[in-house]
Swiss-Prot record:
Lineage: Eukaryota, Metazoa, Chordata, Craniata, Vertebrata
Gene of this entry: CYP7A1
Cited function: Catalyzes a rate-limiting step in cholesterol catabolism and bile acid biosynthesis by introducing a hydrophilic moiety at position 7 of cholesterol. Important for cholesterol homeostasis.
Protein name, as recorded: Cholesterol 7-alpha-monooxygenase
Localisation: Endoplasmic reticulum membrane; Microsome membrane
Keyword Endoplasmic reticulum assigned: yes
Residues the entry annotates as binding heme: C444
Cofactors required: heme
MF term (GO), any: iron ion binding
Reactions catalysed, as given in the entry: cholesterol + reduced [NADPH--hemoprotein reductase] + O2 = 7alpha-hydroxycholesterol + oxidized [NADPH--hemoprotein reductase] + H2O + H(+)
Record SUPFAM superfamilies: Cytochrome P450
Amino acid sequence: MMTISLIWGIAMVVCCCIWVIFDRRRRKAGEPPLENGLIPYLGCALKFGSNPLEFLRANQRKHGHVFTCKLMGKYVHFITNSLSYHKVLCHGKYFDWKKFHYTTSAKAFGHRSIDPNDGNTTENINNTFTKTLQGDALHSLSEAMMQNLQFVLRPPDLPKSKSDAWVTEGMYAFCYRVMFEAGYLTLFGRDTSKPDTQRVLILNNLNSFKQFDQVFPALVAGLPIHLFKAAHKAREQLAEGLKHENLSVRDQVSELIRLRMFLNDTLSTFDDMEKAKTHLAILWASQANTIPATFWSLFQMIRSPDALRAASEEVNGALQSAGQKLSSEGNAIYLDQIQLNNLPVLDSIIKEALRLSSASLNIRTAKEDFTLHLEDGSYNIRKDDIIALYPQLMHLDPAIYPDPLTFKYDRYLDENKKAKTSFYSNGNKLKYFYMPFGSGATICPGRLFAVQEIKQFLILMLSYFELELVESHVKCPPLDQSRAGLGILPPLNDIEFKYKLKHL
């Protein structure tokens, strides 16, 4: 008589055989090389997740510039030749770039789909972002951010004894705290009826945001949030504060949020909590990548004496040209859009910091079967398959960026110290050479504001503070690979630094 263990063993073998026969895709003529992986459903997901860059490089060496991997039940075609990126984007009529993003948002934040095709709303969210994050709207948003950054960095009630003392703090923790508070106030305004509890509320939200953000990669991977009780509670608490009844009593709410409140109320069938969760999605999008990007920009600038010197000279010159005088009395400084855009050294520092730390995954879903025509050949793509670009491969390619792992603050400056816009790969000029914010239709609509708020932060840190690393020759912390594919990778460990207000 067969034992239970033997029965289970036979059952497992049968299941594996069924999987091999029916679940594994067979490569057809004209399709890219295929990696199914060994694990049902997951495919190559574990190998990809442990180190995406090395996984893709290994497959690039094995298969060439185009190959297909099964990841979490989906078939993903990776295009790894940066010279082909513009060719991919020319096939836009075959792509649905919204499907993945809408599905991910609903899954992670807990609202119904915001895709107008699903019938829950008729709002075109991309038009909303374009209208409120660019042009004249960007001017008012940047002005509010500059005011709020100065409010956070130089609070009006700061005792003189504290202003004269050196403060030692983790740099990532410092950037997280400052950028979250200033960014929250800029988007969602402030409750002037409760000034004493305003900061406590935001710091509570900061802690909730950290808890929720910690599990975000797992949510994107498809795990339900109910598996993470603390993160689920944190998400609901964050959303509670963003209900319309709470936002309506706040002053200086951004045009973006005011318009979204109006459109949610007039064009959607969302309940109050779902409306709040669509605002939570905006909060996450405004913070999750900006915070680590701010850290890397500040860290790399302070760590490089040449970068620190060049940035300080540029900022001092810009303030003098604008007639802005630094004062210990708390007078705010301000640079307009034109002045902020005319800071090529800071631009280059930020770009170089993001080049070294970004690991975004540019994704598009095939709406139908079609043939993808690239520089090095044509490939048949099946409906519902995913086309993916992983720009970190390009950002760290020595053929494009010599000595790619070294921070060079002037890498994006030409011989005239102006913005450098021409980069080459093996003698061929690249149309796309810097892509931390995505590309084409999927490019981040808030990228201009993100760069400006980082730039404003650096201007204020250079203007008001003396800055030092506790360990002057500290090594660059490794990147946290658990967030690969989501954007800017945070440091795996924090770096201590010292700061104190300058005597102006």
